[in-house]
Amino acid sequence: MKKLSVYLKRYTAQSILAPLFKLLEVVFDLLVPLVVARMINVGVAGQNRGVLVQCFFLLIAMALLGLACSITAQFFAARASTGFAADLRQAVFDHIQKFSFTELDTLGADTMITRLTTDINQVQTGVNMGLRLLLRSPFVVFGALMMAFTINTKCALIFAAAIPVLFVVVFAIMLVSIPLFRKSQAALDRVTCLTRENLTGVRVIRAFCREEQSVEEFDAANQALTRLNEFVGRISALLNPLTYVLINIAAVFLIDRAAIQVSLGSIAQGDVVALNNYMLQIIVELIKLASLIITLTKSLACAGRVAAVLEQQPSMTEGTQTISGSDSREAVAFHHVTFTYAGAGAPSLMDISFQAKKGQTIGIIGGTGSGKSTLVSLIPRFYDPQEGTVRLNGDDVKQFSRAALCAQVGVVQQRAVLFQGSIRDNLRWGNENASDAELWEALSAAQAKEVVEGKPGQLDFQLEQGGRNLSGGQKQRLSIARALVKKPEILILDDSSSALDFATDAALRKSIKHLGYPVTTFLVSQRIACIQQADQILVLDNGHLAGSGTHQALLESCPLYQEIFDSQFPGERLAAKEAGK
């Protein structure tokens, strides 16, 4: 929580005023039993009606002043806690944006969503209640004790004996609860992860008739969370009954001792009522303190999880250079690159070296899991290789700022991702200042012009979240158009035309080849037909570069490429040989 307290600095005044007004409220509360005692001792016993009326209006005034202090304290506490939560949430979100894909893969999207929402909301609740009650409850308890000593020392000793026992019970339960609340939040992460996984993959689950297994898996995780919460709840539930039992025992001793003191004439009946009122105040405040401790325990556990995100340092150090024009003909070069994903047992890429000249089209092909997507993800520096270097225009990509790389490299990934809003808004992710003419130019090159023209409102057509109101092929073409809007020097198409038919795919490749500006294109595909016209083709096999060259050269020299070709064009290579004879 100490690390997060810096986000309260902007609200220092509110954080001081909230407990201050609560303490003022406490002062009025502690004076009430004394006024009641005076009403009984002087007004009732002495039959002094003037004192009764005076005390009556004094109690009303104190109640109104206490209410005003309470409302003011709540106002300042709410301002401080909501502002703190907003700043903290923004800080965590901004920090996540600095993460490389390595940290994003390690932490997981579901965990970060939980920490940005549920955890920060819980911390906000803890700050709000802490500002209002953390000082109030102990102040009432010790204030009531001091007031009891001013009335009668012997009776006050019962208070002095009961309070430490109550604190021991409360803090013992708190120490047991804190680790359990942390486990509960981890179990909640698991349930959130399964929920997200099942909702996003519902079509696949139904296609394979896996509904029953998904329900069973979710039920197991949900039951584990429920059992843990029930166990924590049972421990937390001990607070109220234990404190009530201890206070009631103390009350019995108090009444017994007070009765003796009254009979001896040491104290008046009104003083006994005041002592009992102070005991009741202690009961109420200790119950509040117990509830506060439960809330703070949850908040501290959540604060630790949020702080863990802020303490996670990005594994990449961002460069500062911009990508300027270079005399180098080399657009992209890999020099003995080896890359391993965090937690993976074996490298995904091993000793990869190649060069791509400016304006060339580079095809990348290989089996599933051969490292095709991993290779192209190193170019925009989504990841850093453990060995070797990746160069753009002759310079190491680590030297460039993220903004510079983003401006020069356009990436269209396997899964087309569109956002809720108009088509125009989505396309302008590539260039927020792009004119409509530039948008239509990119749409035409991506073979998406007819798609947009057929929609009501055309560029103003509203897309649903994730582009749910478009087909797979339409989403892919709009994603390609979005990348083309910023006119990148390097364009990466990571199997991004898999949902297109052969004719549309061929037209797309042709239009990209003849763009009005020079672009180095990387085409990742499972289909030889998509890459056979490339200037250079890279063949990957389990992370190794099995071959590189033109289509014809690989047909003659690369067994793996020959195997892939024969599987997609059976008999064609043999027929060509026969025709050559």
Residue ranges and their predicted role:
Residues R10-A13, K98-T102, T118-L131, L135, ...:
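An intracellular "coupling" helix at the cytosolic face of ABC transporter transmembrane type-1 domains
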Residues M1-T12, M112:
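A short amphipathic helical element positioned immediately N-terminal to and/or at the very start
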